């Protein structure tokens, strides 16, 4: 694995591991923030009513898959797990389209777009083929 692949995996995966661990340890504030979005999702997906449990489960996925990606273990699988986790996290955590205050709306839009960029990076890793891929990163060298 080349140095850029190692660094990229460590930065991308490590960020998820840290944020996920925080959600597992202290889910209350995130559960409150996610509550309205979870209610919307429950209209089409049968989720448990315990918002803190859902935040903890999502955090555990991010912690485990983030750590795996950070060390180059199953990078494509880890990236897919993180991508699947990031979509509801972004929808629930950064609904800038619902915010009236211009400054808060701009801040939440920035966070939404940051998550979209992270999702893009995860999709690059998940979609990279094995042939010609940088060892352990899933990212094509060409």
Q: What do these predicted ranges mean?
A:
Residues 1-142:
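Short amphipathic, positively biased membrane-proximal segments
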């Amino acid at each position: 694995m080349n140095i850029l692949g190692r660094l990229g995996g460590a930065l991308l995966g490590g960020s998820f591991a840290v944020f996920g661990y925080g959600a597992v340890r202290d889910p209350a504030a995130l559960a409150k923030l996610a509550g309205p979005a979870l209610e919307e999702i429950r209209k089409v997906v049968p989720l448990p009513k315990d918002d803190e449990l859902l935040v903890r489960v999502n955090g555990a996925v991010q912690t485990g898959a983030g750590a795996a990606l950070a060390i180059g273990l199953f990078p494509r699988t880890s990236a897919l797990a993180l991508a699947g986790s990031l979509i509801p996290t972004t929808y629930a955590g950064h609904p800038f389209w619902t915010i009236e205050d211009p400054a808060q709306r701009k801040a939440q839009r920035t966070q939404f777009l940051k998550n979209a960029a992270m999702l893009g990076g995860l999709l690059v890793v998940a979609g990279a083929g094995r042939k010609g891929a940088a060892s352990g990163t899933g990212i094509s060298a060409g």
